[in-house]
């Protein structure tokens, strides 16, 4: 009777030892960062150029896209429509340059998180924007499957903003 637990334990150990070892392919994080940087640069170039179709081409089909307003939480189709509508207005012009960009590539090289900060004249010349993006690699292509645009006032300016909103 006492040998039964040992037999079960031995069987489990043998089964675990006989499992094939999965060899992970080494990931070139540097190359992935270059690819993600290129996607982001091209996305922003399309935004500045007012090319809605190019902007949309970088978006993942099952993505989540958030604007600066709390009600702006969109799927790809709704976000694409908003981009297309905004860029159809030829008087609408945006211009900005990325002031700060931080990219983190996941250890498996298949996802990335990007933080970008800039000031965009079309939204506010005084309050910077922080754009958080998540990118996913499928096959050899990277797509943006999450975007969150946020206004990021300086902490010292928050009381002024609160006063202005009274």
Give the ranges of each region predicted by the language model.
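A short gly/proline-enriched turn/hairpin at secondary-structure junctions
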Residues: 64-74, 87-92
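A mature extracytoplasmic/lumenal domain signature
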Residues: 59, 69, 107-109, 116-119, ...
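Hydrophobic pocket/interface hotspot
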Residues: 43, 54-56, 63, 79, ...
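Short beta-strand edge/turn micro-motifs at domain boundaries
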Residues: 19-22, 128-159
């Amino acid at each position: 009777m006492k040998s039964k637990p040992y037999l079960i334990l031995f069987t489990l150990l043998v089964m675990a030892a006989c499992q094939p070892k999965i060899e992970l392919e080494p990931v070139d994080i540097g190359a992935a960062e270059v690819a993600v940087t290129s996607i982001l640069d091209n996305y922003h170039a399309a935004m500045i150029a007012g090319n809605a179709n190019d902007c949309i081409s970088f978006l993942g089909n099952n993505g989540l896209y958030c604007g600066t307003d709390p009600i702006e939480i969109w799927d790809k189709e709704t976000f694409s429509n908003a981009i297309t509508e905004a860029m159809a207005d030829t008087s609408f012009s945006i211009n900005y340059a990325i002031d700060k960009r931080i990219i983190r590539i996941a250890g498996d090289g298949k996802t990335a998180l990007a933080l970008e900060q800039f000031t965009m004249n079309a939204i506010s010349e005084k309050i910077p924007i922080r754009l958080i993006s998540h990118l996913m690699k499928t096959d050899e292509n990277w797509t943006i499957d999450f975007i969150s645009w946020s206004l990021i006032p300086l902490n010292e300016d928050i009381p002024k903003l609160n006063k202005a909103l009274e």
